[in-house]
Amino acid sequence: GDVYKRQGEEIKTNVVFYNFSEVGQNETERVVGGFNHYNDVLVGDVQFLSNNIAVAVGENVISIYKIKEYPSLEKEIQIDNTIDRVFFGTDYIGLVLDNSDSGELYKMVVYNFSGSKVCEAEFGTQVDNIQFDGSSVVMNNSTSFSVFNLKGKNVANMSFDMPASKVLPTGTRGEYILINTKYIQNIKLK
């Protein structure tokens, strides 16, 4: 979890790991690791992506922790642009960054759990939903839908006649369910 401590006028972030198994019972308050190197960066989200991997998302940093019995900081990724959104898959971490200073409005960057960059792509549309669908990234807003592969290539775009509230992957490659206020529709990409 994250703990914010006030020191004078500064706010310090500590990321603390607890272990409630037998390993943690010998530790004070079951704390098996703590990291306080974030200085003045706020860490707003910590996600466990598996039993062995946790990701801490700060204002301008992504920290990947490997956890065996005790956590260790595996990789830290410094982010130059403002992080607009973070999304997670079974094998990947995705970021949507503000890119308005250079080119399109947004940049999507995908990393694997080792912290290596897999791909990046720029796009100009505000998105309401973005998610991984296997080896693709699916994004939509109320009027359009796009699919990117993990090479950063835009492989599909679609516009909607009626505003869509959600586009859901079905688990079959290239097949999605479009939901709006009047109907649910299956979409198959060619």
Protein language model annotation of sequence segments:
Residues 10-19, 60-65, 102-109, 144-148, ...:
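Structural motif
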Residues 56-129:
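Eukaryotic tandem repeat interaction scaffolds
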Residues 165-190:
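Blade-level signature of beta-propeller repeat domains, shared across WD40, Kelch, NHL, RCC1
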Residues 11, 49-50, 58-60, 89-90, ...:
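Short loop/turn segments that connect beta-strands within the blades of beta-propeller domains
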Residues 34-49, 79-91, 122-135, 162-174:
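Repeated scaffold domains used in trafficking and secretory/extracellular systems
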Residues 26-37, 71-78, 115-122, 153-159:
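A short beta-strand motif characteristic of beta-propeller blades
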Residues 1-4:
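Short, small-residue-biased leader/transition segments that mark boundaries at the very start
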Residues 20-23, 67-70, 112-116, 149-153, ...:
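Short loop/turn segments that connect beta-strands within beta-propeller blades
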